[in-house]
């Protein structure tokens, strides 16, 4: 792995982990920056196809969805169709009549680049309970008083760390084992991905999921942890392939050049987009049911 790529990865993980721990508006601001930069790259690819989306309007409304996820998370799902309607209304009154492609790419940008990432904020927020075992900073920030007792960290933080760890395990496992053992191409969409590497990546995510469920004392932790790890491994891979499909259609190798050795923001966050709602509803809907059995 090139030195530049390693340095970028280490810096990125350190920043992401620090902001993840801080939570509150610090984490929301970080996600807002990712949404803004990611949508810029997305709309550059869209324009490369000769399409004229409502880029600025979609960016603003995507950030408003994130604001809702931070302040009123229970209303974010209700705001989503309203913001979609506003995009349609905006395009309706433009001097040049909008095409189906203009409308659909704008709505996809809202969904892919704004609504889905907002689930990371909701997941990190957790149940919103105040945890006394840490320093409570301005802007709803949190910092542990002691690193020796992570069991006292906010539940939302622990679950989000677990989700990140599963994604990292899947990415690292697929990259290393794919380089070593990869023989069978997985898909023409992403020629460098192999079946062998992907299976090892999913296996790494599954293992981390089981360990995390055991640590968090989830009900039936062997099953719930394996299921979550398996789903994250698969969905993060599908997220990667989805972004690769968009890049191939736009005729570009990378979504951008922002991160040395890695490409653009979308190239680094594609595995996270679909994972956030998966983990959120797994924790919010499935675990409470199992707790009552």
UniProtKB/Swiss-Prot annotation:
For biological process, the GO terms are: CDP-diacylglycerol biosynthetic process
The enzyme's E.C. designation: 2.7.7.41
Give the reaction(s) catalysed. Answer: a 1,2-diacyl-sn-glycero-3-phosphate + CTP + H(+) = a CDP-1,2-diacyl-sn-glycerol + diphosphate
The protein's annotated pathway:
Phospholipid metabolism; CDP-diacylglycerol biosynthesis; CDP-diacylglycerol from sn-glycerol 3-phosphate: step 3/3
Q: Does the keyword Lipid biosynthesis apply?
A: yes
- The first-level EC class reads transferase
| Signal peptide span | none
Q: Which InterPro entries match?
A: PC_trans (IPR000374)
Query: What is the membrane topology noted in the UniProt record heading this document?
Result: Multi-pass membrane protein
Q: Which Pfam families match?
A: CTP_transf_1
Q: Does the keyword Membrane apply?
A: yes
- Spans traversing the lipid bilayer: 6-26, 51-71, 73-93, 97-117, 157-177, 195-215, 218-238, 273-293
Cellular compartment(s):
Cell membrane
Q: Which GO terms describe its cellular component?
A: plasma membrane
Question: Which terms in the Gene Ontology molecular function aspect does this entry carry?
Answer: phosphatidate cytidylyltransferase activity
Task: Report keywords, A-Z.
Answer: Cell membrane, Lipid biosynthesis, Lipid metabolism, Membrane, Nucleotidyltransferase, Phospholipid biosynthesis, Phospholipid metabolism, Transferase, Transmembrane, Transmembrane helix
Family under the similarity heading: Belongs to the CDS family.
- Which protein is depicted? Phosphatidate cytidylyltransferase
Its source organism is Synechocystis sp. (strain ATCC 27184 / PCC 6803 / Kazusa)
